[in-house]
A protein has these predicted regions:
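Pepsin/retropepsin-fold aspartyl endopeptidases
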Residues: 19-367
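Bacterial Sec-dependent N-terminal signal peptides
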Residues: 1-25
Length: 367
């Protein structure tokens, strides 16, 4: 079954924050800690961490597409975490909203405490429903800027190092993106024609590749005779319909991916910052590399891993599922889709798929 796609791309503030480059010619980077992570649908990375002195661990998504660090509003209410108006807003695919923030807090990772963090407050109830487990927050730029972070999708472990001279693994390639609060990488797209543009590298997006409709309209990169299908996605501000198609080739550094599932977003709130950025590459491609993210040097090292040649998922059902009150429930059904033709309706309870009755939404989305 087609994976429900969660596009989670935040842009904190309207201004651009540039990460200053620091030089550590003589001081080697030091390993501070390492810990396991879990993959959600689309390769999205889930880690557990503690907040201040609260003993119950929180579930966080590790997201290079987030311009800060944030908490779920329901989590702040449950644990009575104080927060105040920030006077700032976040921009997502379905809207713009003002956010509060909780100031001067500590994030406790296994073997590492990160202090003096300001957490923005957002409603992540839809994330919890999509993934079938409580999502308490997002870890983004506020964390990445402080360390060198190695993400190993073979061992399913994250290693955190101090800034300094770092010995990268042999092989692979070194990207040198433009680093604002989010990494922006020049890429080459080939379909009806060949186009070069900038794209965000977004580990929090559970998809392969996305381009804005404005980018496609202006570049005319897609073949017109290929008819996209409609899907529904979830992001900041609510739900939004999007088109799904295939691009002949997407090139990231020296690596070429062919027949790539591609989402087309009518980006009315310009969350993708077009025309400077054409869209994003998500973690269903990035998970095919072991990555080392080094904001201080403005470098990202990619090393192809055991998932590099995994097949893309081209399946399409036209249904979104959510985990609500212990049940897996169908949401909007795209008219004309296979789910629509099968007679599935909004609010139907999904008891099982292909003789699997596990009631596990993550499993159902991969069948």
């Amino acid at each position: 079954m087609k994976t429900s796609i969660l596009l989670y791309l935040f842009f904190i503030f309207s201004s651009t924050v540039v990460c200053g480059q620091e030089l550590y010619a003589d001081k080697p980077a030091k390993l501070l800690t390492q810990f396991p992570f879990k993959q959600l649908n689309g390769g999205v990375i889930l880690i557990q961490a503690n907040f201040n002195e609260i003993t119950q661990p929180f579930n966080f998504i590790l997201d290079t597409g987030s311009g800060a660090i944030s908490l779920d509003s329901a989590t702040t209410a449950e644990f009575k975490i104080p927060h105040v108006s920030s006077g700032r807003s976040v921009n997502g695919i379905a809207g713009i909203r003002e956010v509060d923030f909780a100031q001067n807090n500590t994030l406790g990772l296994p073997g590492l405490k990160v202090d003096s963090l300001d957490f923005y407050i957002n409603d992540y109830d839809i994330l919890s429903s999509v993934y079938g487990l409580k999502i308490d927050g997002i870890i983004g730029y506020s964390f990445f800027k402080k360390y060198i972070v190695n993400i190993d999708f073979d061992s399913m472990r994250i290693r955190v190092f101090t800034h300094g001279k770092y010995l990268y693994p042999q092989g692979g390639t070194m990207l040198r993106p433009l680093f604002t609060a989010l990494p922006i990488q020049p890429m080459t797209i080939k379909d009806a024609r060949t186009v070069k543009s900038n794209f965000y590298l977004d580990t929090g997006a559970g998809l392969c590749f996305l381009m804005s409709k404005a980018f496609n309209d202006d570049s005319m990169v897609l073949r017109r005779k290929r008819k996209p299908v409609s899907i529904q996605v979830q992001g900041l501000g609510g739900k939004k319909e999007m088109s799904l198609t295939v691009v002949s080739q997407v090139q990231l550094g020296p690596y070429k991916f062919r027949k790539v599932p591609t989402n087309i977003l009518d980006d009315e709130f310009n969350a993708t910052s077009y025309p400077f950025v054409g869209g994003l590459i998500g973690n269903d491609i990035l998970r095919r590399f072991n990555m080392t993210i080094n904001y201080s040097r403005r470098e990202i090292h990619l090393l192809p891993n055991s998932h590099f040649r995994d097949a893309f998922d081209y399946s399409y059902t036209g249904i979104n599922m959510y985990y609500i009150d212990g049940k897996i429930v169908a949401d909007e059904i795209i008219k004309g889709s296979p789910a629509y033709k099968a007679g599935i309706k909004k609010d139907d309870v999904i008891m099982g798929i292909n003789n699997n009755f596990s009631n596990d939404i993550s499993v159902y989305k991969t069948l």
